[in-house]
Each structure stands twice: as structure tokens, then as C-alpha cells.
Amino acid sequence: MTADRWAGRTVLVTGALGFIGSHFVRQLDARGAEVLALYRTERPEIQAELAALNRVRLVRTELRDESDVRGAFKYLAPSIDTVVHCAAMDGNAQFKLERSAEILDSNQRTISNLLNCVRDFGVGEVVVMSSSELYSASPTVAAREEDDFRRSMRYTDNGYVLSKTYGEILARLHREQFGTNVFLVRPGNVYGPGDGFDCSRGRVIPSMLAKADAGEEIEIWGDGSQTRSFVHVADLVRASLRLLETGKYPEMNVAGAEQVSILELAGMVMAVLGRPERIRLDPSRPVGAPSRLLDLSRMSEVIDFDPQPLRAGLEETARWYRLHKR
């Protein structure tokens, strides 16, 4: 479908001031949608930028509070065509380890409140940003969408993974019991302009960029052999909207085709910044799964564009960081 699928439609985006949510807001506004941008945490610069867009209305909402969510939907719902759910408590491996209870509690309450309101207020469709961390890791076999916890349910005390698993199960049950038109997107590691560069909590790419740009060595948790698939945030947004446009699959992996080790990634980051390689391994720190290889067959069928190569995406992200760092 063409961009006019979104022109004149009203789309509610949660986590609208966050990294992924703000990119959805910008792209939807550019494509002619009326955007209801829900947020909880103040981010003044992004807030001012989005408020200046022609078709964006910012609404502060505590998604963990059922009455607050219902109040927002009651006020906004008569015109909502689509919900894009990006809000989630997230962070790097250390953050997830230390705050698992808080993450699980926050994320499961948020998705429960949201899906109940989508049902009760008759919203036409919802896409949920899930996670590829749901899959059991294999260094050689790419995870297909049907290879998730339904095939291999396993115990974990990782509150983030548990919250995403709960969210997917609840979404499926809403689809089956209430007929909710819900889509689940499972991204690889998302990166790009606008990400948070807090090294104590941030994702791997912004953390590496911040340290390398400051002339510090990059610390890699583990031996650096763990591999990941990365996806530029703009590609994630475009692929998710294409999934809604086509309605082709209920779940879809979204990632770039390149699978790189964390050690290779560190070298790429140093190179795009023009820094000499200064890398230190710390085997005592948590590393997550050794591999997270994703099958992208569904994504290849759905999208109508070529995802950005990792090197080009890193160069763009590095330029953005150097312009906006403090």
C-alpha cells in the first residue's frame, strides 16, 4: 500500500517520547496521520520537537494505572484507528538483571491495561513491540516466528523476557477470545539516532559510541563472541507499518540480515568514529544469550524497501550523537 493508507487515520502511540516511539510519531505525522502521543517521562527536547509537528497531540498518561489509561481512552478513543504500543521498561543486560521485578511488574501492567482498553473502546488494530529475546538461542539455526515459547517454554528469572512473554500470551488470548486485531513485532537489537546514550543503562551500540567518542576504551561483557542481529530504528518503524498495511502475519521478526559478534561491532564503532581500537573484555559481566539469529522470511515478504546496512547506520548514528551530545 502507499503512504495514503495512513493519511487522515488516527494513531495512538505509547512511549511516544521514547527512542522507538518518537520515531513512530515522526513517520506517522510525515505520512499524514493524526497522532495521539502518550508519554509518561518528560523529555523536554523531544517533547518540544514533537509538539511542533502539525498533526501530533501529546497526552501525559500513566499506563501502569488502569484508571488513567481508561481516562485517556475515554477522552481520545472515538477516533482511534490504530494503536502502536512501544512503551516498556528496558535497559542493558545489567539493568535487566538488577531490576527484573520492577520491569516485570511495570510491563505486564502496561500491556494488560492497554489491551483491555483496545478491546473495550473498539480500536481497530494494535501492533505491539515485543522482543526477539523470547527465543531459545541457537548459534546455527535461525529462529522462525513459530519457534517461540509455544514450542519451547523455559524458566527464566529475567523480568524483561517474562514481561514480553506475558504480553505475547495475553495478546494472543485477546485475539482468540475477543477478536482483537493484534500484531506482534519481534525486533533484533534496535539502534539509530535518538537513542539513549547513558552508559549505565543504554543499549550496546549507544554505549559503545559514547565511550569511543570520549576516547575511552570499549568494555565488552564476556569474550565478545556473542552475536546479534541489529535493526535501524527507521527500518523497524517502516516494517511495522507495512505489517499493519498488509495484515499478512500475526507475528514478524524484524532485523538486518547481518549477524555480527559484539567484538566485531566494537571494531566497527571505533572505525566509524576514526578512533584507534581500544577494547577490554570483562568475562565477569552478564552477556545474555550467546547468539540470537532470526529468520527474516516473513519480513522479506512484507517490506517494500531495503534495510539499511549496519555500517551506514552506524555512521548516521555517530553523526547524530556528535551533533547532540552534551
UniProtKB/Swiss-Prot annotation:
EC supergroup of this enzyme: oxidoreductase
Keywords: Antibiotic biosynthesis, Carbohydrate metabolism, NAD, Oxidoreductase
Binding site for NAD(+): 15-21, 129-132, 164, 187-190
Entry annotated with the keyword NAD: yes
This protein's name: dTDP-4-dehydro-6-deoxy-D-allose reductase
Transmembrane segments: none
Native organism: Streptomyces sp
GO molecular function, one term: oxidoreductase activity
